[in-house]
Design a protein with these regions (language model features):
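Chalcogenol-based redox active-site neighborhoods
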Residues: 1-155
Length: 155
């Protein structure tokens, strides 16, 4: 999939770990970071989530909303949040509809085999609803949140 940079962010409506429905249209006027990850409570995803946790106050000071998205259930998200003290909302996309719209679900190679799955990626949506940054394939999960914050600081 081509980069989404410069395009209107695809809308979505998903249930969040906070018990409410979330849609990109509800964040008009705010900068939103949406990061897509494969699975709660797995090594790479936990490192990425904990790195975002450590930087969450920096994001809040900049007025940035952070949302994590995976196919996991809300029950799984609740456990993940509790286990690691995550201070941000996780969205459940069990059918991968939003992930497909954002290029975060498709064919990937794991351990030499092709399979369909979540592609670790991140988008930054500006206050006008336009995607201003799109990391299409995140390779270093633990370091990636710092790159996101650096991008936002230097914008």
């Amino acid at each position: 999939m081509a980069s989404l940079e410069g395009t209107k962010a695809p809308d979505f409506e998903l249930e969040g770990s906070d018990g409410t429905k979330h849609a990109i249209r509800n964040y008009s006027g705010k900068t939103v970071v949406i990061y897509f990850y494969p699975k709660d409570n797995t090594p790479g995803c936990t490192k990425e989530a904990c790195s975002f946790r450590e930087l969450h106050q920096d994001l809040q000071k900049m007025g940035v909303v952070l949302l994590g998205v995976s196919k996991d259930s809300l029950k799984s998200h609740d456990k993940f949040i509790r286990d690691f003290g995550l201070p941000f909302v996780l969205l459940s996309d069990p059918e991968a509809k939003m992930m497909q719209d954002y290029g975060a679900f498709g064919e990937k190679v794991m351990y030499g085999k092709k399979a369909m799955g979540t592609i670790r990626s991140t988008v930054v949506v500006g206050p006008d609803g336009t995607v201003v940054k799109h990391w299409q394939t995140v390779k270093k999960a633990a370091e990636h949140p710092e790159a996101v914050v650096d991008f936002l600081r230097n914008r």
